[in-house]
Amino acid sequence: MKVMVLSLGKASPSKSDHELLDPFVSLVEFSVSPPGGFKDHPHRGFESVTYMFQGGIIHQDCNGNKGTIHEGDVQWMTAGRGIIHSEMPEEQVNKGLQLWINLPSSAKMIEPKNIEISSSEIPSADDYGVEVKVIAGESMGVKSPFYTKTPIMFLDFTLDPKAQTHQAVPESWTAFAYIVEGDEGVFSSSDSSTVQAHNVVVFGTGDEVSVWNTSNSRPLRFLLIAGEPIGEPVVQHGPFVMNSQDEIEMTIGDYRNGMNGFEMAKHWRSE
């Protein structure tokens, strides 16, 4: 299995990025403090997964959902046909990661949904110096109870010094790893070069992902994310992810006119 290392810092994925990482649209590691944050804004056509590393994010949306996720918690939001929400920092230092997952054309106009998953609800396993938290999918005999519209795997691994792991992944799926902590991880082949933290490793075709922590003293933490490609055109315009430019223009019109999923646009404001 070949790998490609990407830096996480590109604000606007290109068409080739979408094809390479299908069904994933974007991955962003964030650090936000008051008075900053993400004030009221719309979305359509995808799902987002927010995973907290430190602090807390207060979430509100136009459907009456309100809550706060803290370290180890997950917010899984299906934007579907339309949602307006805010994401604001709770503490002075708030860090996490947000993944956008595309929806197939048949599901882009489904009803929006928001699920908060506390860290205590996320199943985990620990064996031979390898710990995994199973946010979506299955690993080390443990399966997540949470259903995802687009089939994906979202695993949070921590490897002790000199530990290794081998994770099965469906051969047709897109798979990549994001290194959260540790600079001596080796991916795919034991003789590959080490990859530093805050980089993305994109895996080639294969049915297994292998990872070694070559450090003598430091743990290696990484997220392994994989999903079934949708194979449809992707056109992204800011917070909207559709299949064509015509659909993007229709979405902008729906938002401006408060219709087809954006009925609350003219009246709703977060607290």
From Swiss-Prot:
Per the annotation, which location comes first and is thus the protein's main one?
Answer: nucleus
Q: Does the keyword Nucleotidyltransferase apply?
A: no
The question of whether rRNA-binding is a record keyword is answered with no
Where, subcellularly, is it found?
Nucleus
Entry GO CC = nucleus
Instruction: Cite a single Pfam family from the UniProt record.
Output: Pirin_C
What's the protein name? Putative pirin-like protein At3g59260
Q: Which family does it belong to?
A: Belongs to the pirin family.
Keyword list, A-Z: Nucleus
